Amino acid sequence: MQYDERYTPYIEMTGLLPFIQLVSRSTPNLNVAAVTALIDRWRPETHSFHLRTGEMIVTLQDVSMITALPIEGKPLCMSTDSEGWRQQMEALIGMPPPEPEVEDGGKKDRVPADAPFTWIAANFAHCPEDSNDEVIQTYARVYMWYVISRTIFADGTGKNAPWMWLKALTVFDNKFSWGSAALAYLYRQLDDACRRSTKDGGVGGCMLLLSIWSWERLPVGRPKTSKWNTWDDNGNPVRLPTWAYKWDVVSEVASKVNLLYKQYTNKMDSLTAEQVEWQPYCAGPNFGDAHTFELNPICL
């Protein structure tokens, strides 16, 4: 799904523009072994990572600095009731995904209220050039739905976009606290992952947020920054880079995941307080790593 500049005013109304600007570019590679070693130290009883140095958590400050998602506003509380969701989706974006085929004599399983990412991309990847404002709004809405379902509210499978996140975008100017929702969702996904409550044992939530939080604070699995691609803010302060730009392009992990996991686990076990960066978001040598760039004002 390619970003279209015609979507910008509608995305900006939702408060998602800085984050969309961030993830619409190439994001740094995920170090699976390092993330797994970190998740192993998550405890659902306290919703925190238990390390030798003490307990650590991802906070709303981290959400704001790394993603620039709004942390103030109305709580994003969406009903999970899926009755009539196909009709509602058709009214909102013009069509629902096709119903799954059932073989003759087969039992029709309960269909989840979501749409495959492949279906979304096949039908809404490109907004026609001669589209009127209403059509552009529809494509912008679907684009945001696609992006946040793959990033903020990823479920670990990478297959479907839940209907409730599209429903949350019915009105653009709802002033939702997307940052609070992102953090709560990440906590829940970490709870599920450390309990291995899903069939695949995977993890969802905003892995970009978790990865950069870890790189900023812990030396375990921290990559080297190789370069910074040009950032085009189009003269709009809201589109300036977030703190995540420090890690725009990082070195790739070359070793085998299983071997790295053991190494990272041992490093986590021996981590000292002196090795932890307790206050990463401050002026000074850390900030200069990104060649001194103007930070998005929403992060401050």
Task: Cite the ranges covered by each PLM segment.
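Structural stabilizers in ordered domains
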Residues: M1-L300
